[in-house]
Amino acid sequence: MDEVSTVNENENRKTMIEPKKLNKRKREPTAIENLTSEEKESQISSLNLEMKGLFDYFREVMDKSKRTDLFSGFSECSSLNSMVALLMEEMSLPLSKLVDEIYLKLKEKTESVTMVAVKSAVVSVGQRVSYGVLNVDADVLEDDSESCLWCWETRDLKIMPSSVRGVLKLRRTCRKKIHERITAVSAMLAALQREETEKLWRSDLSKAAEKLGKILSEVDIRSFMDNMMQKNSSEMAEKDSKREEKLLLKQLEKNRCEAEKEKKRMERQVLKEKLQQEKEQKLLQKAIVDENNKEKEETESRKRIKKQQDESEKEQKRREKEQAELKKQLQVQKQASIMERFLKKSKDSSLTQPKLPSSEVTAQELSCTKHENEIGKVVQAIDNAFSTTCEATVDDIRREHFASWRQLGHLLSSSKKHWGMRRQPKSELFPKLKLSTNSGVTSDGEPNMEKQGDGCEENNFDGRQCKPSSSNRKKSRRVKQLLQFDKSCRPGFYGIWPSQSQVVKPRRPLQKDPELDYEVDSDEEWEEEEAGESLSDCEKDEDESLEEGCSKADDEDDSEDDFMVPDGYLSEDEGVQVDRMDIDPSEQDANTTSSKQDQESPEFCALLQQQKHLQNLTDHALKKTQPLIICNLTHEKVSLLAAKDLEGTQKVEQICLRALMVRQFPWSSLIEISINDIQDEDQEASKFSCSQSTPPSNSKAKIIPDSDLLTVVSTIQSCSQGINRVVETLQQKFPDVPKTKLRQKVREISDFEDSRWQVKKEVLTKLGLSPSPDKGGKRLPKTISTFFSKRCLPPSTKPQPAVEDAAERLENENA
């Protein structure tokens, strides 16, 4: 565009100069019109010479040697049209010859090109332009006359390579200037060669002369083209430099991008290797975890197999026990048949004898089996009972039954035992009927019937009916009642409530008694015993009765171990001045005399005072369970620590000194040992003397160390059930600790609040834990109606969410 604008500026400047020449020529219009024939001939000959020079200059511009500049951009052509346009530009051949030549050149580069494609491309892309004297009858595509000066040009320069566009524009401008001059000269020749007799001769001649004066001559065209070529070459050089600079910048940018890509590729490679290592590490850890899980499963399977074996052994023992019981029942039936034969001799007396109730018979038989030395009395009492002839009515039997029941309840309440702890007790009251048995140890759960036998049974066996006295009637005015809720997991209460409420009355049953704690829910703390774990004393076989003594001995050992203190443990008042207490008075006197002699030297006194101060600090550290840090003690071989290149014994001593080096304790302050610290020593001595005067307390040893206190606290917080379940969970984590110690530890560090065991705040503060706030905010007091509705209404089929959450937490902890 810059070249075209420059050409236009030069043309405008030339047109601005031409009017002056025209004005000069217009001053002599008659000079051209009044030429003689000789002058015309000379003018025509000069114009012919100029025409010949223009033709030669056109051929010079269209020289083939100059067309080689166009082929420098042939490598930039990517399509068939662009290649055809570059080969066709400034060619003067007819269409057929041009197509053949272009086809041959393209055939060398691309074998797939065809003649038809080349011809269609030439026709569509290029056009044939005449820059000479145009013949109207000539064929534009096939004419080959030299006077027409034919030239093929590309319709649109955009399809040409950008490097040759400027040169093509200059050459086209030069050809146009030559064509304009040729046209003007040919018009002037035509006007001069016409006859003067024609009408428009003068006007045509003047117009041709005026047009010829406006058009640049050959010399002007040459100078104009030289200037344009120089300017174009400078511009092209500048463009080339800019292009090279851009290419250099692009190359630098490309190199930088490649370097960044290489860097990113290396980073990705490193990251990939790191991820591969992490993946391998995870796989290794997973393999280790799988192996551990496999070992756990194997141990669990072994435990399961062992448990199944134990259960099978128990089942075998139970079957053997049942068979033994069947044999014993057969023996009892045999004894009963023998008694029937014996009773047949006194039919009259047996017919008149009243039948006693079954409860009395069972009570009598239980009292018979208690002690071996009372067998004769019981047999005699049974014989007296069989021989009684008194008649008893139904009311007498009922009254007698109630009296024995009340007396038994009174005896149980006096011994702090509650009859009816369970509505369906697992133990049988009388497993077999026999007159004499081996003496056995009575269980704690069976009611002791000896006192009842001393009272009511002796009177009954002597032939007198047991009738309650007046004193017994006064005591049994308040009849015992059974308080049993329908859907409650706890056993019912059977007995007499000793006190009466002053607030809760028949007309005010829903009032709150201040003496009762309505927030405590005993059902949440109660836990049913699992089946197969608790066996009553009546179901024990002979082997278990023999092992009972061993178990009692073990229990006694455990109870004795409660008072034992582990090795290295020191309570608050123990470990203080132990050496002083162990020294005999005689030895102490001897030491005092010797110490008095040694104290004469000041150095020995200072050393003794330091030892005494060190002993006091050590006792203080042992008493307070804190470490003693000493910072200013030196050793005679401290220089060996910094020495290098040691060998032999010195090298071994250096290693030992480094291992035994006293280092700063990070959580405690340094303690300087002062020689003149007499006041502190006196205070410590007074404290130690006081501690010696007081006897040491027999504190129980802590079986669970303080390092495991955090585990105990987390277990208590995660378990929302009763203390039995908490102790069972702790037993799984600490199998070596007895349950009594675990129960004591739970009660020591926690309180039962809000229907669960909660850890004390001081324990949480000691461990650095924050007490969890109440989730439910303030808890409203429970009313007595809520208390009774919870126990009297049928339970919902959906389980409580708190119990589910607690069970899930417990399973997670066990896992």
Curated annotation (Swiss-Prot):
Pfam families: Cac1_C, CAF1A_dimeriz
Biased composition (Acidic residues): 516-532, 554-576
GO biological process: cell division; chromatin organization; DNA recombination; DNA replication; double-strand break repair via homologous recombination; heterochromatin formation; leaf development; multidimensional cell growth
Recorded superkingdom: Eukaryota
Any GO CC annotation of this UniProt entry: nucleus
Biased composition (Basic and acidic residues): 10-21, 292-328, 806-815
Gene Ontology MF annotations: histone binding
Keywords for this protein: Chromatin regulator, Coiled coil, DNA damage, DNA repair, DNA replication, Nucleus, Transcription, Transcription regulation
Phenotype of null mutants: Fasciated plants with broad, flat stems and disrupted phyllotaxy. Shoot apical meristem enlargement and altered floral development. Reduced heterochromatin content, more open conformation of euchromatin and dramatic increase of homologous recombination.
Any coiled-coil regions, as ranges: 244-336
Similarity comment text for this entry: Belongs to the CHAF1A family.
Protein name: Chromatin assembly factor 1 subunit FAS1
Organism: Arabidopsis thaliana (Mouse-ear cress)
Gene: FAS1
